Amino acid sequence: EEVLWGRMYNTGQVCCASKRFLVHKSRAEEFTAKVVEKISAIKRGMPADEDSRLGCLISEKAAIEVEHQVALTVKQGGKIIVGGKRDGAFYDPTVIADVPKTADVAKDMEIFGPVVPIITFDTTEEAIEIANASKFGLCGCVFSVNMKEAFYVANSLECGGAVINGASFFRSFEMPFGGYKFSGIGTEGVMSTFNEMTRTKSVVLKNILK
């Protein structure tokens, strides 16, 4: 549920949406099957339709860009399990398995659409290495029943925010919000805003005892 929320919300057009999914090889088959099952049940349609759960992208141009990015990912070794079709500004919810860690989408190519690229790993250190091999670093998330391991990974991610066992775009107004590397300069949030808008001045009084 959290994976779909983090990827499909607003048709995947969110800056801090979950865009790459790193799954341990021992869980990849089960994870992929569950995601495909959930995604296949999503009703696509217009926002005015109360039963619709997934709308179109912001424009047909944006959908065409997603189409090209998916095609590139397949060319680089990924395999479409479900979806992969465009209809005007609509793009079907898509799952791409077997994505190699050398693929563009595993590094710096961000897909702003309803696409779940699945990249497998063997060890925790390998997962951290793949996650950090990007010039971007806004948000990330970690799913694990091992809290010690989860906090270790969260602290190791080169990003401005990390959510444990939840979608990556969790945000509360009092939290500092910002990224590392190419993902912005500075942070937003109540205290961050106060600090940003506060001008400090030092006044020194000398020779007071003369």
Describe each region flagged by the PLM.
Residues 43, 76, 92-210:
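Conserved C-terminal structural/oligomerization subdomain of aldehyde/semialdehyde dehydrogenase
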Residues 1-101, 164, 210:
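ALDH superfamily catalytic-core signature
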